């Protein structure tokens, strides 16, 4: 069977690429360095495939189709919203595992939307290029990736409970896969940030540290207990992406965790948190 061996919770902040020199150099260096640390740790894990759980930003899915959750099972490229330092490119997909996750889910009460050809946005491509692709370079082998997109940025939002259940379904499907792949899962999202509102540029460090404390104690329940009203008020509309974190945490079933970095960066409009979700090797 395939095995999920680790996971990461990371941001996908496009302003880092558009305005890389906006914050003080030491702050910027810590944020970019956190991606490199994640890449080094991922390379050390010797994984074959990474499942990246992100969300659309009204770029890939429009008013005609807003899936609650979608998995890409075929040809991949991206990001659609390419920017300096994040160029559009072909992406190696683990088509067999992605198809299995969708098929297994359909038989188990999870009605996946399936994309047999897919172009990603920055929520996938930032962690892919900065962590997965970089780990491939360090390791000297190709690491494949599977995009999973949740409705966590555009309403109607996927519920927190269903986000957790979907992560559990991913874990169950991976365990049932007839292969010996080593898998990692990345939950891609910001903590506090306001997108397209007058509050844009505000970072609520207290809220961020509360969320990171829940992540570090592997406390999905406390994140799930946050009402959408509180998230929107204290974390902004961008913090609805916490659903991505919950889904990833449920999929990884970690034994411990480590804070790699946290920086509140108003110049990049968000709180940047990086957490590694670790599994006991004897259990993986």
Question: What kind of region is each of these model predictions?
Answer:
Residues 155, 168-183:
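Non-transmembrane, aqueous-exposed alpha-helical and coiled segments at domain scale
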Residues 12-13, 55-57:
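Glycine-rich His-Gly loop
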Residues 48-54, 148, 181-189:
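Beta-strand elements within well-structured catalytic alpha/beta cores of enzymes
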Residues 56-58, 191-192:
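Catalytic metal-binding/acid-base residues of hydrolase active sites
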Residues 1-48, 63-165, 176, 198-284:
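Flexible, D/E/H-enriched segments
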Residues 189, 194-199:
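Divalent-metal (often Zn2+) His-rich catalytic cores of metallo-beta-lactamase-fold enzymes
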């Amino acid at each position: 069977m395939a095995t999920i061996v680790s996971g990461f919770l990371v941001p996908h902040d496009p302003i880092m690429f558009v305005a890389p020199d906006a914050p003080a150099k030491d702050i910027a260096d810590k944020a970019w360095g956190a991606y490199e640390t994640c890449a080094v740790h991922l390379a050390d894990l010797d994984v074959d495939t990474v499942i990246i759980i992100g969300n659309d930003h009204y770029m890939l899915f429009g008013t005609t189709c807003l899936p609650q959750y979608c998995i890409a099972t075929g040809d991949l490229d991206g990001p659609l919203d390419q920017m300096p330092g994040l160029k559009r490119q072909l992406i190696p997909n683990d088509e067999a595992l992605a198809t299995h996750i969708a098929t297994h889910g359909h038989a188990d009460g999870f009605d996946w939307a399936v994309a047999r050809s897919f172009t990603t946005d920055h929520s996938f491509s930032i962690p892919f290029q900065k962590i997965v692709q970089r780990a491939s370079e360090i390791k000297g082998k190709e690491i494949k990736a599977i995009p999973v997109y949740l409705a966590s940025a555009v309403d109607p939002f996927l519920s927190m409970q269903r986000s957790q259940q979907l992560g559990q379904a991913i874990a169950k499907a991976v365990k049932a896969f007839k292969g010996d792949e080593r898998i990692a899962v990345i939950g891609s999202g910001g903590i506090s940030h306001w997108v397209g509102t007058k509050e844009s540029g505000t970072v609520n460090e207290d809220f961020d540290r509360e969320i990171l404390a829940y992540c570090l104690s592997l406390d999905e329940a406390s994140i799930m207990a946050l009402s959408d009203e509180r998230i929107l008020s204290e974390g902004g509309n961008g913090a609805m992406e916490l659903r991505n974190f919950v889904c990833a945490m449920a999929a990884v079933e970690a034994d411990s965790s480590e804070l790699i970095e946290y920086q509140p960066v108003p110049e990049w409009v968000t709180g940047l948190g990086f957490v590694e979700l670790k599994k006991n090797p004897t259990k993986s």
